[in-house]
């Protein structure tokens, strides 16, 4: 059973709800890709959006299980773009029992002369700070909130702009880098996450970045929706296709 909390005139009311479908989907991804192991110290990348908030909620529930034994905490990288949602985020994480640390940076000041702010630059700077923090504080894994749609959209963007087949791996380890990136939401799509966030009562208290509306990802999302008709089963087929490559019948 999980607790669901909603904001009502500045107060938080909690109720108990059954384990949602989203958590079962995350469990499958975690199991399939061996994302959580005994002794892990996992840093949750808490952007404040519905995806990473749902991910933190999952980890809060997962920590209550007996096995595997691991530790998890969250880091929010606050930027000069704005973090007006932060007070609510802190309260929600505290209620779940997830320690949340906030680090403030200026992504605008880091832009080179003549360059414009975009999704890639902002996200790369936040991941850089996440990696530094993880190494400094003994975390061996960073949990990112990228979901199934993100992965497929990235594959489409790379195929149509770079002419290469590449996306976001569920687990990304490095030979010369001590921190592994994991994406527990890799099998969950946007509608599933939205339904969960609505059910848990935090869909309206999480953030959405305005720069996403002007990015190539918005176009890729539209293409993915047309290609799959928004059906989860077809998205999973595309995801599986990225793993089942028959080179004998390719150029």
Annotate each predicted stretch with a short phrase.
Residues 111-114, 216-218, 247-250:
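Short, solvent-exposed polar/charged micro-motifs at secondary-structure junctions
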Residues 233-251:
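A short, charged, Gly/Pro-tolerant segment at domain boundaries
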């Amino acid at each position: 059973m999980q607790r669901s909390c909603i904001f009502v005139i500045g107060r938080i009311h909690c109720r108990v709800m059954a384990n949602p479908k989203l958590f079962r989907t995350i469990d499958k991804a975690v199991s399939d890709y061996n994302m959580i192991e005994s002794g892990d110290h996992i840093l949750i990348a808490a952007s404040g959006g519905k995806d990473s908030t749902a991910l933190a909620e999952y980890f809060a529930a997962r920590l209550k299980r007996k096995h595997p034994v691991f530790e998890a905490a969250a880091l929010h990288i606050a930027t000069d773009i704005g973090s007006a949602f932060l007070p609510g985020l802190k309260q929600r994480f505290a209620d779940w029992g997830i320690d949340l640390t906030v680090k403030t940076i200026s992504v605008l000041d880091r832009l080179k002369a003549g360059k414009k702010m975009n999704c890639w630059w902002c996200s790369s700077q936040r991941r850089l700070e996440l990696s530094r923090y993880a190494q400094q504080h003994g975390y061996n894994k960073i949990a990112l909130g990228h979901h199934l749609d993100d992965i497929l959209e990235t594959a489409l963007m790379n195929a149509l702009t770079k002419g290469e087949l590449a996306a976001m791996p569920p687990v990304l380890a490095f030979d010369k880098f001590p921190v592994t990136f994991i994406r527990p939401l890799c099998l969950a799509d946007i509608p599933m996450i939205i339904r969960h966030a609505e059910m848990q009562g935090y869909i309206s208290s999480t953030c959405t970045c305005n720069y996403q509306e002007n990015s190539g990802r918005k176009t890729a999302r539209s293409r993915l929706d047309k290609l799959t008709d928004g059906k989860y089963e077809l998205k999973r087929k595309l995801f599986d296709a990225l793993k089942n490559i028959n080179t004998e019948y390719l150029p």
